């Protein structure tokens, strides 16, 4: 073996040994790998992150609903301003009415707050948005009180939901065989939740009649614990019901003009002018 070949082998061996030494030293000096997330604190942190993601998704859905409400209200006010004589026999909508303007302002402020929650990039921004939404001095509080009272009102919510619930078994019996498995399961879940909502209404005492205008302009009266619990249960059930999309048109009729079903199976405004016209006809 020549001296040159021997030297090459020696150099290569030294390089390999140096690399192995560097690797070994690196394993000793490297930052330790993080431990598995098994402690209670880490589990709480993980759950908080999941809760924030869920809340942000809900805020985005809520913001979409508010945008539709604002669009419809603006279209109605624009239409009333352009042709105040239209809709004779009904209470005309005054585009300069202080209460209507206050409602629009509250809706837009509520949209801004929900946007802060939905688009928060860190936990601090997320909590700040939530604090703004639930502040007792929030200008949206009267509007939110109106929504809460309306949702909890047996007179407003119960009759149409009860009618759908009562007619659902016959619909499933007549049409169940022709539905795909996913749609049939969704309708069955919808029927189940509707039953829970109706039961909740039926076991509650009669609630005071809701006056939307008064509720939107005055602080809500102090609610008793039973009413608060009633609303919380209804709120959760209504959110769950929404997850199963629009009921069969055979039970509720086709969507009004100007509306269409979105990718999640829920109704949304597609044409504000047509939707406003449909609302005025109902």
Curated annotation (Swiss-Prot):
GO terms for molecular function: peroxisome membrane targeting sequence binding. InterPro entries: Pex19, Pex19_C_sf. The keyword Lipoprotein applies. One of its GO terms (biological process) is protein import into peroxisome membrane. Residues 73-95 are annotated as: Disordered. This is Putative peroxisomal biogenesis factor 19. Belongs to the peroxin-19 family.
């Amino acid at each position: 073996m020549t001296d040159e070949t021997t030297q090459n082998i020696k150099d290569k061996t030294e390089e390999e040994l140096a690399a192995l030494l560097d690797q070994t030293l690196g394993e000793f000096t490297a930052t330790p790998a993080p431990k598995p997330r098994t402690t209670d604190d880490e589990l709480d942190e993980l759950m908080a992150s999941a809760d924030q993601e869920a809340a942000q998704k809900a805020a985005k859905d809520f913001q979409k609903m508010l945008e539709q409400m604002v669009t419809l209200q603006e279209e109605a006010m624009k239409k009333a301003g352009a042709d105040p004589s239209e809709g004779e026999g009904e209470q005309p909508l005054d585009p300069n009415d202080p209460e209507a303007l206050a409602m629009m302002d509250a809706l837009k402020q509520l949209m801004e707050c929900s946007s802060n929650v939905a688009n928060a990039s860190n936990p601090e921004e997320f909590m700040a948005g939530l604090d703004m939404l639930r502040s007792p001095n929030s200008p949206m509080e009267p509007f939110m009180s109106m929504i809460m009272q309306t949702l909890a009102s047996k007179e407003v919510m119960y009759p149409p939901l009860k009618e759908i619930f009562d007619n659902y078994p016959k619909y499933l019996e007549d049409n169940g065989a022709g539905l795909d498995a996913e749609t049939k399961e969704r309708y069955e879940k919808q029927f189940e939740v509707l039953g829970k909502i109706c039961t909740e209404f039926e076991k509650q005492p009669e609630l005071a009649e809701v006056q939307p205008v008064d509720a939107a302009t005055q602080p809500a009266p102090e609610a008793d614990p039973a009413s608060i619990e009633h609303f919380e249960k209804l709120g959760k059930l209504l959110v769950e019901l929404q997850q199963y999309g629009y009921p069969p048109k055979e039970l509720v009729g086709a969507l009004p003009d100007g509306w269409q079903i979105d990718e999640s199976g829920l109704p949304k405004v597609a044409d504000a002018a047509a939707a406003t016209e449909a609302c005025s006809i109902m």
